[in-house]
Amino acid sequence: MASRITPTLSAPTSEATTDRRQDILNAALACAVDGGVDAVSIDGVRARCGASVGSIYHHFGNKDGIVAALFFDIFHDQSRSVQAQLDAARGVEAGVRALVTGYLDWVVAQPERARFLFQARSAVAAGPRTPDLAQAASRRNQALVAWFEPHRQAGAVRNLPCELMPSLVMGPVQSYCRAWLSGQEGPSALTSPAIYREELAAAAWRAVRA
């Protein structure tokens, strides 16, 4: 008689764990959309996704852990999206423009997640994952510096310290997107960044071109 092989349950279990984790993060984002970062709570998350208190604590420890985990998930998603646009660009001008439009397009496509990044940053910076935030921000910045350096050496961009380049290129689009996200409704609402996509990209290139 052929022996029966008991199917492994590790993959489904892992998938279920991942799904539950994501359910909790989605619920936390929904809380933040309704009332800001301060509205994220264990009870609020539990009510929205049906996770047990034990499950929430198992995955994230506490409310601060949920906020930080959601922040880093969104932060890394944004970084990957912008990096993909930069990698696809051909030439320094196209690359500079891709940094701006990649960031802008990501924000416009998912404003709730983008708003959470701005809102939660100070809370994460003041919490136990401060070193993780510093490391993630530094890693992203250093990747941009490394991209600009050969172009600076080749004379394609201004002969400025490359550590300044990310601020010159990304500063304006980040500032406008932040202002737009802070008040998307009412008579004082700003025009969507999508309308100024070309202007912001062109301004970034003018700021650094040789």
Per-region residue spans from a language model:
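Amphipathic alpha-helical segments used for helix-helix packing
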Residues: 108-128, 178-182
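Helix-turn-helix
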Residues: 20-23, 31-65, 69
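Amphipathic, non-transmembrane alpha-helical scaffold segments
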Residues: 17, 67, 71, 75, ...
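Generic hydrophobic, amphipathic alpha-helix propensity
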Residues: 20-28, 45, 70-74, 78, ...
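C-terminal peripheral helix-coil segments that are non-catalytic and often amphipathic
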Residues: 1-8, 105, 138-153, 172, ...
